[in-house]
Amino acid sequence: MAVGLLALTVIVDRGQVLIAPVTLALVIGLMFGPLADRIERAGVPAPISAATIVLVFLTLISAVIATIVIPLTAWTERLPVIWARVQSILADWKDLMTTMDSMSASLQNALGQEGNAAEVKVDDGSAVENVAWLAPAIATQIVLFLASLYFFMATRHQLRSSVLGLCFDRRLRWRIAHVFRDVEALVSSYLISITAINIAMGACVAVAMALLGVPSPLLWGMLAGLLNYAIYIGPAIMAVIMLGVGLATGSSTTDYVAPMLAYLAVNMTEAQFVTPHVLGRTLTLNPFIVLLALAFWIWVWGPVGGFVAVPLLLIAAAAIRHVSPANHRRFALEANAEKN
């Protein structure tokens, strides 16, 4: 079993370019499955319904990216200011003076004086070259994702019928049908609910940042909502980002930590009260298992892994619920009880 898991990990890691976008498309397709069913019940053919959903999804994602990238690019120029603030704070700790001196020298070299202009140009050229090399691979993954999403949405009923047609045993066919039903219901319910929660939380973070006078409050609200898809890890990253924002914009210790504390207050309210109330007990998963899944999928697939980790756990839970031997016995007892 250990060898099989290791082999699966290697396959998932090495096949990221192919497997990651297809998996993401399947998860997104499960999310929009109920919407596609409603459109098709209105008499719209499945291919047109799938194309409509893909276009709407692509438009929304493009709008989100455009809203985030432009202000975020401007904020990257403040990184030297943030690092300088960190230096000035840590410099007050006498036991870290030696470390900070070396960091100061490294920072001055990285920022570059007039004589180091040529080095900065070389670094920029290298960055542009890296982007040029990565662009075709990224474009290929995007096209593969969109194509997979469209064809899955357009043919998902045929796929389900084909899989059920391979099951010659009636009881097995019944179980597999319930797996399909529960997978779509669980993943769709989870992603729609968590998306609504993240939008509301992002709006609250944006309002909080605006009240604190933090520049670009909409940016931080949208970023908080996006990172919240990767539970546990995403909020931790966002807290560090907000601390950096406070260091870049504040003038006192209170100003430094206020954005981070405001974000943590909103996030803790969402995590402790809103999410448990909205999702309920039906979608609760063991936090330790969730953390392990997040760590694993982020390790192999990065941000895409963070998004699909929980949906993949829900898919596995639905399959185990109907396929495990213990549930086989339970279903048999229920069937006998119904006959009697």
Where are these regions (language model features)?
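Generic alpha-helical transmembrane segments of integral inner-membrane proteins
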Residues: 2-7, 11, 23, 51-64, ...
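Alpha-helical transmembrane segments and their immediate interhelical loop/hinge regions
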Residues: 134-247, 253-259
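N-terminal hydrophobic signal/anchor transmembrane helix of membrane proteins
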Residues: 1-10, 203, 233-240, 246-254, ...
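Juxtamembrane membrane-interface segments in integral membrane proteins
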Residues: 35-42, 48, 63-144, 162
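Short amphipathic alpha-helical coupling elements at transmembrane boundaries
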Residues: 37-41, 74-77, 81-88, 92, ...
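Anchoring transmembrane alpha helix of integral membrane proteins
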Residues: 1-70, 145, 165, 314-340
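Hydrophobic alpha-helical transmembrane segments of membrane transport and translocation systems
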Residues: 256-340
